[in-house]
Amino acid sequence: MKMSKLSDLEGHEDRVWNVAWNPSGTILASCGGDKSIRLWGLEGGSWVCKSVLLDGHQRTVRGVSWSNCGRYLASSSFDGTTCIWRRQDDTFESCATLEGHENEVKACGWSPSGRFLATCSRDKTVWIWEVGEDEEFECASVQTCHSQDVKKVLWHPDRDELASASYDNTIRFFCEEVDDWQCYCTLDKHASTVWGLSFGPGPEPQLASCAADGSVYVWGTKGDRRSWELCGTLERHPRPVYDVSWCRTRGFLATACGDNAVRVFVKDGGDCSWRLGCTLTQAHSQDVNSVSWSPSGGLLASAGDDGYVRLWQID
């Protein structure tokens, strides 16, 4: 396979940490060390910055996540807060600020039902917020299972179950029981910090994880949907892998690496066999921090320490 660069999206004044598509694939959100969130969209056939959100955070914005309805955008920051933005046509307004974490909030994520928002932090905790009426957010649970900085939270695409990744080298899964949220599974095969997670397509999707030692693992369930096991390993990267994104329409896996490259892997026969499809060797001039496939699978967005957001297309 071949991929080519479609567009350079310039505007951030510091490293770009994260990119995320809205559910319809019409808006790409990016965030970075300049404390801003930028929203990109098509205008006259070109991708341009449609809006800049500057007044939500006092420090680096580390993560962004869209609700499934597309009306809300959450942003997590090193200032210890998570900001909720409401979309009204082409404008975004801050409608809530979530406080409680003792340190930097590294990531945030909406549940598929829209009932919950998860946040994770350097303070080693995962918070699960219940979304109430009138845009009110109440902390439903604080999970303290991890022994180190929690880097990523990601909800299962079809049910309200949560995965988290940590500096303690583990991945943990959480579900709601009768009176609280519980950790029901821990994956401990990684030998270094787990940076990123991405669920695949299908009725019982697999999970991809990436780590500081260059490893990318694929996990699956057999029979018991709450019993996860390692079922595949991708070619080891030469530097840390900071993010992974699974294309839910075409099945490709993209990785963001500390060697400035973006790689795309394709399935090679069975469910757990993968081969390298293509390498974008100098996708960025510095570390690549984030990759995200558009919902249609036609575009791949990447973000790096060089301050650029880039869009790539399959030739």
Swiss-Prot record:
GO terms for biological process: iron-sulfur cluster assembly; protein maturation. Disulfide bonds: none annotated. This is Probable cytosolic iron-sulfur protein assembly protein CIAO1 homolog. Pfam families: WD40. Belongs to the WD repeat CIA1 family. Gene3D superfamilies: YVTN repeat-like/Quinoprotein amine dehydrogenase (2.130.10.10). The lineage of its organism: Eukaryota, Metazoa, Ecdysozoa, Arthropoda, Chelicerata. One of its GO terms (cellular component) is cytosolic [4Fe-4S] assembly targeting complex. Keywords: Repeat, WD repeat. WD repeats lie at residues 11-50, 56-95, 100-139, 145-188, 189-229, 236-275, 283-315. PANTHER family: CYTOSOLIC IRON-SULFUR PROTEIN ASSEMBLY PROTEIN CIAO1-RELATED (PTHR19920:SF0), WD40 PROTEIN CIAO1 (PTHR19920). Essential component of the cytosolic iron-sulfur (Fe/S) protein assembly machinery. Required for the maturation of extramitochondrial Fe/S proteins. It comes from Ixodes scapularis (Black-legged tick). It comes from the Eukaryota. SMART domains: WD40.
